[in-house]
From Swiss-Prot:
One of its GO terms (molecular function) is mitochondrial ribosome binding. This is Translation factor guf1, mitochondrial. It catalyses: GTP + H2O = GDP + phosphate + H(+). Belongs to the TRAFAC class translation factor GTPase superfamily. Classic translation factor GTPase family. LepA subfamily. NCBIfam families: lepA, small_GTP. It comes from Schizosaccharomyces japonicus (strain yFS275 / FY16936) (Fission yeast). Residues 51-232 form the tr-type G domain. Its main location: mitochondrion. It is a peripheral membrane protein. PANTHER family: TRANSLATION FACTOR GUF1, MITOCHONDRIAL, TRANSLATION FACTOR GUF1-RELATED.
Length: 644
């Protein structure tokens, strides 16, 4: 299969308008001398010329060994000590260590001696999951080259292709590297053939390494120095730097990670944003090594952090250009903001925690600019937020980080996607909050749901189960091809709502962990979408409302009512739980009344005494049912929404 047959969709998505050109890495030169690591990076970097700077990233599909390879490189450059343990130094977040995945791009500057010259190597370790593709995009903006890492046991997978074309579109030098060659299941020859067939990369330029044992990693560092070009910049020009990442420090405020395009950045300098015109005084600059190391200056071509007295996280706009006060430079294009694909409502478990929780959410959003944050309110749960994410894993990681880093837990409603509604008067609007979705079909002319063009890569023996999975999710097959004799590529048009509803886990299950996917927005398509509401004793509970396809309404309603019935405690009167769709009750569960024995103290006497007590009890329960409100504890909502 040729490049055009397999990757034409990716070319159309990412390279539209670019001229086709072959991608070949530069030829290798002489082998290096033994590395002599330098400890004081701040002092050494100040004397390294621009021609000896290399800015590069590692890109790959998830679980292909990026973080482990980074550890071996850090060991060889003297940044960390050699260890037989599993370190994953650049995976700094506890959620990354716990899950074993990279969710946040991390930078590390290193000094390496090659042919008796010192080189400054700036490494960026990027995530491999599709939900964090924006991190890859921002990272590549600071690089001149990248390592395309491919698992020799699995071959090219969906995100391998997507990340390749992100680097290709930026005209970066791409070094193909096969990892895990020490495993008995490795098939390097087959994977090399895939690299030639899919990407038109010269197999002779590929390097075979083992990030676990460190085999051929020194040769890889040499190849980076030989093949990745140095930054093109003017050291004597006015300062010009671009913000590529930011995070919040409790004591220092907003810290930025910048790439110096021209000139130099020193502590004490007065700078301003070319876009917002806000001014800042630089308190400190330095390198990530991988922890912050203070330096006197950041020179042209270098990547480092800056502490600049920025207190408001909203002022740190990724892609923003900065220069010295009194100078004028042309602003860089900036980064295109990705639109959220899944939304949830979030509320504090304890309402008094709202202010501190709001600060924590803002600080996390500063570190991950793909998160959408908007204040929202609920009649049931009070004031909260409307949050948007790039996928279900993105949402899950956000909640974990909120708990790990800020000790906060939130009550999160069922995820929804944005729907496009055409009203009777011809006007259209986007609705992602179930509370804003119309109850009756007569209120609107048409509802359209977002679609995703999904590319799935998996072993060919799982074609049947994968096709059945896609069909059960209302998918429409677009293409079917074979990457090789052993790997199949399916392209399906799927509703975004089904893709976000555990589809990736189901794919992994039916392919025994060997399936992968990549997707892109495919516009909107008309669909039979309705709102499902829940009532307790006739009172609507807005926090439980959801939007879904009509085919799933009855099944979802019955299952939800049964779960809700098991969570709400019994009252002294009968409680009706109902599910309503388009103003019609479609399902019901009843919580029977808790019986109190009012005749317990009647040990004898006239039977009419007992009858009178029972009659009074029935009338009292009738009044309670008519006028009483069921008070639902916050924990009931938490248990219900977490299990759903």
């Amino acid at each position: 299969m040729t490049l055009r047959r397999f990757s034409y969709t990716f070319q159309a998505r990412i390279l539209r308008g670019l001229q086709a050109r072959p991608v070949f890495v530069l030829p290798s030169r002489s082998h290096s001398t033994k590395a002599r690591p330098v400890v004081d990076i701040a002092d050494a970097a100040e004397h390294i010329p621009t021609v000896n700077i290399r800015n590069w990233a590692i890109i790959s599909h998830i679980d292909h060994g990026k973080s482990t390879l980074s550890d071996r490189i850090l060991e060889l450059t003297g940044v960390i000590e050699k260890s037989s343990g599993k370190q994953r130094v650049l995976d700094k977040l506890s959620v990354e260590q716990r899950r074993g995945i990279t969710v946040k791009a991390q930078t590390c500057s290193m000094i390496y001696e090659y042919n008796d010259e010192q080189y400054l190597l700036n490494l960026i370790d990027t995530p491999g999951h599709v939900d964090f593709s924006s991190e890859v995009t921002h990272s590549l903006a600071a690089c001149e080259g990248c390592i395309l890492l491919v698992d020799a046991t699995r071959g090219i997978q969906a995100q391998t292709v997507s990340n390749f074309y992100l680097a290709f579109a930026r005209n970066l030098v791409i070094i193909p590297v096969l990892n895990k060659i020490d495993l008995p299941t490795a098939e390097p020859e087959k994977v090399l053939a895939q690299l030639e067939e899919v990407f038109e990369l010269d197999r002779k330029e590929a390097l075979l390494v083992s990030s676990k044992t460190g085999k051929n990693v020194p040769e890889l560092i040499d190849a980076i120095i030989q093949r990745v070009p140095h930054p093109i910049c003017d050291e004597n020009a006015s300062l010009k730097c671009v913000l590529i990442d930011s995070w919040f420090n409790t004591h220092r405020g907003v810290i930025g990670l910048v790439r110096i395009l021209d000139g130099k950045l020193v502590a004490g300098a007065a700078i301003y944003s070319v876009n917002t015109h806000r001014k800042y005084v630089v308190n400190e600059v330095g390198f990530m090594h991988p922890n912050p190391v203070e330096a006197q200056v950041l020179l042209a071509g270098q990547v480092g952090y800056v502490n600049w007295n920025m207190k408001n996280s909203a002022e740190a706009i990724l892609g923003d250009t900065f220069t010295q006060v009194g100078h004028v430079v042309k602003a860089m294009p900036g980064f295109e903001k990705q639109q959220p694909k899944v939304y949830v409502n979030a509320f504090p478990l304890v309402r008094s925690d709202y202010d501190s929780l709001s600060d924590s959410i803002d600080r996390l959003a500063l570190n991950d600019r793909s998160i959408f944050v908007e204040k929202d309110t609920s009649d049931t749960l009070g004031i909260g937020w409307r949050l948007g994410f790039l996928g279900s894993l993105h949402l899950s990681v956000f909640l974990d980080r909120l708990k790990d880093e800020y000790k906060h837990e939130v009550l999160v409603t069922a995820p929804t996607v944005p729907y496009r509604i055409t009203w009777k008067d011809g006007m259209t609007s986007m609705v992602s909050n179930p509370s804003n979705f119309p109850d009756a079909r007569t209120a609107y002319a048409q509802v359209e749901e977002p679609m995703a063009l999904v590319t799935l890569v998996f072993p060919r023996e799982y074609v049947g189960p994968v096709m059945n999975l896609c069909e059960s999710c209302r998918g429409t097959q677009q293409k079917c091809s074979f990457l090789s004799t052993a790997r199949c590529v399916l392209e399906y048009l799927l509703p975004m709502s089904r893709l976000m509803d555990g589809f990736f886990d189901q794919l992994k299950s039916c392919t025994h962990g060997y399936g992968s996917l990549e997707y892109e927005d495919a516009g909107f398509a008309p669909s039979d979408i309705v709102k499902l509401s829940y009532l307790v004793n006739g009172m609507p509970i807005d926090a439980l409302c959801t939007i879904l396809h009509r085919s799933s309404v009855l099944r979802t309603a019955r299952a939800s009512l049964q779960r809700l019935k098991s969570l709400i405690p019994r009252q002294l009167y009968e409680v009706a739980l109902q599910a309503m769709c388009e103003k019609h009750i479609i399902a019901r569960e009843t919580i029977s009344a808790a019986r109190k024995n009012v005749t317990a103290k009647c040990y004898g006497g006239d039977v009419t005494r007992k009858m009178k007590l029972l009659k009074n009890q029935r009338e009292g329960k009738k009044r309670m049912k008519q006028f009483g409100n069921v008070s639902i504890d916050q924990g009931v909502f938490y248990d219900f929404l977490m299990k759903s």
